[in-house]
Every structure is written in structure tokens, then in C-alpha cells.
Regions:
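Active-site neighborhood of HAD-like aspartate-dependent phosphohydrolases
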Residues: 1-51
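Non-catalytic pre-domain segments flanking phosphatase-related domains
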Residues: 1-13, 169-198
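A short acidic, helix-capping loop that chelates divalent metal ions and anchors anionic groups
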Residues: 21, 26, 58-63, 92-97, ...
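Substrate-recognition element of Asp-dependent hydrolases with the DxDx(T/V) motif
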Residues: 36, 40-73, 83-95, 134
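Structural recognition of alpha->loop->beta junctions
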Residues: 72-88, 152-173
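Conserved Lys-Pro-Asp/Glu-containing loop-to-beta segment of HAD-superfamily phosphomonoesterases
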Residues: 98-128
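Acidic, Mg2+-coordinating phosphoryl-transfer loop and its flanking beta/alpha structural elements
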Residues: 122-159
């Protein structure tokens, strides 16, 4: 019997794969979260395509130059290995684009680039808009909370994992639903005050 696997797993960048540094334009500040490389390598070994879907509103705000964004993303790949697709929304909150999470555009674009149906993808992220974008695209969303994750985002998530290793294991086991972990890598007590828009 063939083991089920997702058509692709798409990750948020900041706060999920690497430490969240607000409006980071410095590759030297890129720091993977614990276990990120191992979780990604597990998917690579299984032949599952992986990608990044990330909001980068600092570009629209003039805080991140496009070339610096590319340099930061290149550093992410240097530390975590290659991704099969990157999709970045450079727009601001009020720009009205279709790609900015929680809208489904980034997820749909990434799935299209990989040649897979969005409904067979899994999206892993650390805040509500990541799993909301997954839901809007018809994909499966898994939340990995950090201190920036709001309690209501945890409560609203259909699936919650303590860390990336658990999220990847859950992504590859659609029939298994382990107990929800309130907090994960954080306390789940994040506040809107001080949370930098992405």
C-alpha cells in the first residue's frame, strides 16, 4: 500500500522557518528555528515538494529593497536547503492585492508553479493569517504557535502542532489528529500590540 503524502508543503517564512526579525533586510540576521532543517529534510527525503509563501510588506513600505529581500531569501536557502518554489507578497495591508495572506493568492500561485492542486497542499505557519490563507485556497493549514500567536488564532486553527517536526509529521498523516497543543513554541499569549505586520 502506498503511503499517503501531501502534494506539497508550503511554509510561512518569518516565525515559522526562521526567527521573526521585523522587516529584516540583513542576511546576517537570519536564524533558523530549532529543528527547521531536519523537518525540511524529512520532506525532501520523502519526495514531497516544499515551498515558501511569505508576506513582506516592508517592501511596499520602503523598508526593504527588493535586492535585500532576495539576499535574505538566499540566506534562508543557504541555511535550510533549497525550496521548490518561493512566492512573496510585497504589498501592504491596504493595497488590495489577491496575494497577501490571509487571501489565498500566494498558496494558489505556489501550487500552480508546482503543478499540484491547492486542495492537496498543506500550509504550515505561526499566525492566523497563514492557516486562513490555506483555508481560503482549499488547502490544509497547520498552526505552529509562537509568543506572537494570539490565543484566538490558536482556538480557531483546525490543527495545531508544538513545533515543525510535529507539524510535518501531522502533514503526512491525514488520518491522525494528535491532541491540540495550546502554545507550542510560545505561550499563545501574543498581543496585537507590538506584533509587526508582515
Amino acid at each position: 500500500m502506498t503511503r499517503w503524502r501531501p502534494a506539497a508543503v508550503l511554509f510561512d517564512r518569518d516565525g515559522t522557518l526562521v526567527r521573526d526579525v521585523p522587516y529584516n533586510d540583513d542576511p546576517a540576521l537570519v536564524e533558523p528555528v530549532p529543528g527547521a532543517r531536519e523537518a525540511l529534510d524529512r520532506l525532501r527525503a520523502a519526495g514531497v515538494p516544499i515551498g515558501v509563501v511569505t508576506n513582506q510588506s516592508g517592501v511596499a513600505a520602503g523598508l526593504i529593497r527588493p535586492d535585500r529581500l532576495r539576499a535574505v531569501n538566499a540566506r534562508v536557502e543557504e541555511l535550510l536547503g533549497p525550496f521548490d518554489v518561493w512566492r512573496v507578497c510585497p504589498h501592504g495591508e491596504r493595497d488590495g492585492c489577491a496575494c497577501r495572506k490571509p487571501r489565498p493568492g500566494l498558496v494558489r500561485q505556489a501550487a500552480r508553479a508546482l503543478g499540484v492542486p491547492p486542495g492537496e497542499c498543506v500550509v504550515i505557519g505561526d499566525i492566523g493569517r497563514d492557516v486562513e490563507a490555506a483555508r481560503a485556497a482549499g488547502a490544509r493549514g497547520i498552526l505552529v504557535p509562537t509568543p506572537q500567536t494570539l490565543p484566538e488564532e490558536i482556538a480557531a486553527a483546525a490543527e495545531v502542532a508544538a513545533d515543525l517536526a510535529e507539524a510535518v509529521a501531522l502533514a503526512c498523516r491525514p488520518d491522525a489528529r494528535p491532541p491540540r497543543v495550546a502554545g507550542g513554541r510560545g505561550t499563545g499569549r501574543g498581543s496585537r500590540i507590538g506584533r509587526t505586520p508582515r
